[in-house]
Amino acid sequence: MRRDPAPGFSMLLFGVSLACYSPSLKSVQDQAYKAPVVVEGKVQGLAPAGGSSSNSTREPPASGRVALVKVLDKWPLRSGGLQREQVISVGSCAPLERNQRYIFFLEPTEQPLVFKTAFAPVDPNGKNIKKEVGKILCTDCATRPKLKKMKSQTGEVGEKQSLKCEAAAGNPQPSYRWFKDGKELNRSRDIRIKYGNGRKNSRLQFNKVRVEDAGEYVCEAENILGKDTVRGRLHVNSVSTTLSSWSGHARKCNETAKSYCVNGGVCYYIEGINQLSCKCPVGYTGDRCQQFAMVNFSKHLGFELKEAEELYQKRVLTITGICVALLVVGIVCVVAYCKTKKQRRQMHHHLRQNMCPAHQNRSLANGPSHPRLDPEEIQMADYISKNVPATDHVIRREAETTFSGSHSCSPSHHCSTATPTSSHRHESHTWSLERSESLTSDSQSGIMLSSVGTSKCNSPACVEARARRAAAYSQEERRRAAMPPYHDSIDSLRDSPHSERYVSALTTPARLSPVDFHYSLATQVPTFEITSPNSAHAVSLPPAAPISYRLAEQQPLLRHPAPPGPGPGSGPGADMQRSYDSYYYPAAGPGPRRSACALGGSLGSLPASPFRIPEDDEYETTQECAPPPPPRPRTRGASRRTSAGPRRWRRSRLNGLAAQRARAARDSLSLSSGSGCGSASASDDDADDADGALAAESTPFLGLRAAHDALRSDSPPLCPAADSRTYYSLDSHSTRASSRHSRGPPTRAKQDSGPL
């Protein structure tokens, strides 16, 4: 339902018409600040000025009509008491469209809810229109303008100069005007007025300043709240002129002659002589200012120096950056080199440790490579050479291992001193094995760790060790003088660990290979350690075990025992055996004794090794102990016939022991023999060597269990082979003693004297 126009509404038309003719400000903020009521509304309908209620729903816009406007938004400072969603009547001379939104700048009338337009309505969808209105219609937002102090400028004729006027405050934005000598300046060809920073400042710019432009300038800023002014001065320096001194009165050239002077020169006409002259700007000279005078050389030079300095700084920075980059690259290279060198040194150190002589289970010279074994799995690893003949180096029959600086004692026996002896260094090293009566045990097994050093003996400890070895050697010589002679030597066997080939393999500095002996000790027996100048040569040995020990049980197969004689206890061999047993086994008591050859053949041997590698059979291809030949008659011819045709025996894979079948054959041959081991003469031995007698195979490293089984077997002992043996006699006293013990049979060949 449409509301009827209020009474007296026709009287409003006069006021509306006046509002249409009122001047409007250029700034929207000025209009908003000037108008008493500012609202945003939507046109609901239009009515003619006569108040007729029969107008159509949609009518074209027309001036002098009354519009029904619904208030959508308002500003507190200019609300006029209106509320949102309220409908008011607005008389406007501007064309309006129904259902369109406008910002109305209104003035109240005498009638309530009836307003007239103060300024033309503005479309709120324009650029920042509503925002600009909000900036001015806020509390304490509108201020009068306040200008900053203007700086005076000084320039030369023809230069470009400008004066700047800037407002420090002012809302709405003020408008600017420039004045000189009380006259307002407008834009022209030589003068331009520019605005910047949202019309917050104004600039008066001269394209080419002239002498006439010098003077005082005034800038005025004004808004609806007030105005402010500021003053500034422009100074123009005069330049030299080419006017002749004799010239009279001069005046400026007319427009047609102004082009006579170039480069900003001012043309003058000299009356009287009717000649044109030019007033040249700074830096130019000549009749027409066509020459560059280099007047501003210092100024240009300053710019050039500044540019040169900047260029120099840039170059310095570039060179510094390159140097820093090279330094970083160098540091990275040095770090990488040091790291690589350290890794290479560690690798070489590991390789040297792997080649160190103290490394266990090192492969011996000329021997096959075996996998590394624990000390519990192997007692000794020996490698036998097939082409090296038996050497002349001998080893004493005592089984006590002697080393420098160590002593093993038992409560009831004498102490045994262990010192390594070496008499011929140019040939090879030999081991002197001595054994006291305290080292007697069937269940004892061991491995000795020995390493050969290559350093020179210069330290006091080494000199002391040499002195001890010399003293021990002289003591052993005295003890050997009182002992009966023994004909077989462990060194006579080619496969013996004390042979030249084996010892050289152990003592070669280039192929240092350790040989281990481990002794199982009782829990109550302490151990001791032998120290040497070289810490890598230290040897740890157990003391002597206080139990009984038989020498023959340690080396069961090194020598072939002789077959039994005609009867027990008869013959020179039996006497020698008794003498030997009484000397070495004083506490054995009465009972059956073993043959002398069996005991003598096993002295000085090392314990057997239970570890046998089948792949080594092709390398270690020596023969085992062959059975003795059939009984030889007393004549030399018969002995030659019986010694021919020796039979080879193949050894079995079980710890190098002979098979049971071979043992039975040897037993049958031994029973048929009519004489003992000691009945063979030197001539028979020579004949046996000429006929190719059997060469015994060295099996010195047999297991303890196999050795004990061989010793405790019921089969009679075998005689040792007579080939490739080295015999020795200790001295004249021992020779006489051996002749007394063996009256009937002749003695064997002379052996080498003294250990090597």
UniProtKB/Swiss-Prot annotation:
Compositional bias (Low complexity) spans?
A: 404-416, 654-682
Ig-like C2-type domain residues are 145-240
Tell me the tissue specificity: Highest expression in the brain, with lower levels in the lung. In the cerebellum, found in granule and Purkinje cells.
| One Pfam assignment | I-set
Residue ranges that the UniProt entry lists as topological domain Cytoplasmic: 337-756
Q: Which residues lie on this side of the membrane: Extracellular?
A: 20-315
List every stretch annotated Disordered. Answer: 402-439, 557-578, 608-694, 711-756
Q: Does the keyword Transmembrane helix apply?
A: yes
Q: Propeptide spans which residues?
A: 1-19
Its cellular-component GO annotations read: extracellular region; extracellular space; plasma membrane
Q: Where is the EGF-like domain?
A: 249-290
InterPro entries given in the database record: EGF-like_dom, Ig-like_dom, Ig-like_dom_sf, Ig-like_fold, Ig_I-set, Ig_sub, Ig_sub2, Neuregulin
The terms under GO molecular function for this entry are: ErbB-4 class receptor binding; growth factor activity; receptor ligand activity
What are the alphabetically sorted keywords of the record? Cell membrane, Disulfide bond, EGF-like domain, Glycoprotein, Growth factor, Immunoglobulin domain, Membrane, Secreted, Transmembrane, Transmembrane helix
Gene Ontology biological process terms in this record: cell surface receptor signaling pathway; ERBB2-ERBB3 signaling pathway; ERBB4 signaling pathway; ERBB4-ERBB4 signaling pathway; nervous system development
Basic and acidic residues bias located where?
Answer: 424-437
Q: Which domain of life is it from?
A: Eukaryota
Q: Which residues are glycosylated?
A: N55, N186, N254, N296
Family in the record: Belongs to the neuregulin family.
Q: Which PANTHER family match?
A: HEREGULIN-NEUREGULIN FAMILY MEMBER (PTHR11100), PRO-NEUREGULIN-2, MEMBRANE-BOUND ISOFORM (PTHR11100:SF20)
Please quote what the entry notes about the protein's domains: The cytoplasmic domain may be involved in the regulation of trafficking and proteolytic processing. Regulation of the proteolytic processing involves initial intracellular domain dimerization.
How it assembles, according to the record, is: Interacts with ERBB3 and ERBB4.
Name the record gives this protein: Pro-neuregulin-2, membrane-bound isoform
Q: Where does this protein come from, organism-wise?
A: Mus musculus (Mouse)
What phylogenetic lineage does the species belong to?
Eukaryota, Metazoa, Chordata, Craniata, Vertebrata
